[in-house]
Regions:
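A charged, amphipathic alpha-helical module
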Residues: 2-30, 140, 144, 148-273
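Redox- and metal-dependent alpha/beta enzyme cores, enriched for Fe-S-associated oxidoreductases
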Residues: 26, 37, 43-55, 239-303, ...
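Short, charged, surface-exposed secondary-structure boundary motifs
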Residues: 60-69, 131-135, 267-274, 363-366
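Glycine-rich, highly charged phosphate/nucleotide-binding loops
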Residues: 68-86, 301-312
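Acidic/His-rich segments in extracytoplasmic proteins that coordinate ligands and/or metal ions
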Residues: 79-152
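TerminUS-proximal long segments
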Residues: 307-322, 326-381
Length: 381
């Protein structure tokens, strides 16, 4: 199958998650909504159910969710609730609500109340002190709770061997996505930012084994291509999410390719594998423990600005000329971190721009002007 045909299939999935959900339900699969961030999807998969990512929507308007949410909740969380309320997600058999930020914590309770007569909500509280033994034990207790709730929905026990098998499936998927990110940069004349986003976004709505098989086929086609002749500029993207095709078209129109990303919706979600050698449940706990350089996670060495330096090094090592930060409106962790990230980028001499984004935005005129000007600056350096 050609690159164009494979990408077209991924794009169709990314553009129509509701249709994808219906297809799995029609096939007899139970589906569990998975909100951001770092939920152990492997447990859902091990139960024989389909994990279904919930990252807001670029096409819906917040209406009914306003009854539950303060105005300063980020639109990703509000739109997840909106889709649960307006029937978009009626086919779900349950939803996992992680609580890793100040918006998701109360939102988990809003969803629990709003969905009390509709579907079970599985509360998940990750430990911020995740390195110490007590943090690992807390995480294990939480994952055991999630496992128990999933068993109620599935109607059967989730066995250790099934979790181990799920970990292998997910590790293969993570490896394939990491490879794709590199190949997309190497062949940015073929994989533009819109296509790159669609391929990665589709992973949230597909069976991981099916997704990985298709992605491996795409990677093989990309490897066979000659070296790219790229006359534009390359950047690293950073933020929570940047999947709006209208905004990404601005990158394409200005010959801006994405060399790598530090995006929660993209590479942050598949940086860290789970061990295939240890106890499967502990492997998932240690996977979370080993997750690092994330603005949403506590860093006991934050005074060293490790994350800022990590992002700066990513720009250098990827061959990018600058960084574009997508600042999600009302995202406290990102807003609080920005001065430290700016300090690291300035110290490394890396040009960057910060764009305020929101899933309710429909006019990207200001962002387009900023990106065009930034591309012009980078092109003459």
């Amino acid at each position: 199958m050609s690159i164009e045909a494979i990408v077209k299939e991924f794009s169709a999935v990314a553009a129509n998650p509701k249709g994808q959900l219906k297809a799995y339900k029609d096939a007899g699969k139970k589906c569990i909504g998975v909100m951001p961030y770092y939920a152990p999807e492997e447990l859902v998969y091990a139960a024989g159910m389909m994990p279904f990512g919930m990252w807001g929507s670029n096409s819906k308007t917040i209406q009914r969710a306003k009854e539950y949410c303060a105005t300063f909740y980020c639109t990703i969380a509000q739109l997840d609730l909106e889709m649960l309320l307006d029937g978009t997600m009626d086919l779900l058999d349950g939803v996992i609500t992680p609580t890793i930020c100040d918006t998701l914590r109360p939102m988990s309770q809003n969803i629990r109340v709003a969905m009390s007569e509709k579907l079970p909500c599985i509360f998940l509280a990750h430990p911020q002190n995740r390195f110490a033994d007590f943090g690992k034990q807390f995480c294990m207790d939480q994952y055991d709770h999630v496992k128990g709730e999933l068993e109620k929905i599935a109607g059967h026990e989730i066995k250790s061997e099934d979790i181990a098998a799920a970990i292998k499936v997910y590790n293969k998927s993570r490896a394939a996505r990491r490879e794709f990110v590199k190949l997309a940069s190497d062949h940015c004349d073929v994989i533009d930012p819109i296509m790159r986003s669609a391929v990665l976004k589709a992973a949230w709505f597909m069976d991981k084994a099916e997704y990985t098989e298709k992605l491996n086929a795409l990677n093989a086609e990309l490897k066979a291509l000659p070296a790219a002749k790229w006359n534009g500029v390359k950047v690293v993207t950073s933020g929570i999410i940047c999947d709006n095709p209208v905004l990404l078209k601005v990158f394409k129109d200005n010959n801006v390719a994405i060399a790598a990303d530090d995006v929660a919706h993209e590479s942050r979600a598949f940086r860290t594998d789970a061990s295939e050698e240890s106890d499967p449940m502990m492997a998932l706990v240690e996977q979370f423990t080993n997750t690092d350089y994330d603005v949403l996670l506590y860093d006991p060495q934050s005074s060293k600005n490790r994350r800022g330096e990590f992002v700066a090094n990513m720009v250098k090592e990827s061959g990018a000329q600058g960084l574009v930060l997508f600042m999600q409106q009302f995202c406290d962790p990102e807003e609080m971190e920005f001065p430290y990230l700016k300090k690291a980028l300035d110290a490394a001499g890396i040009p960057f721009i910060k764009l305020g984004v929101d899933q309710q935005m429909r006019d990207f005129g200001q962002a387009a002007t900023a990106i065009q000007a930034f591309a012009d600056v980078l092109s003459v350096q």
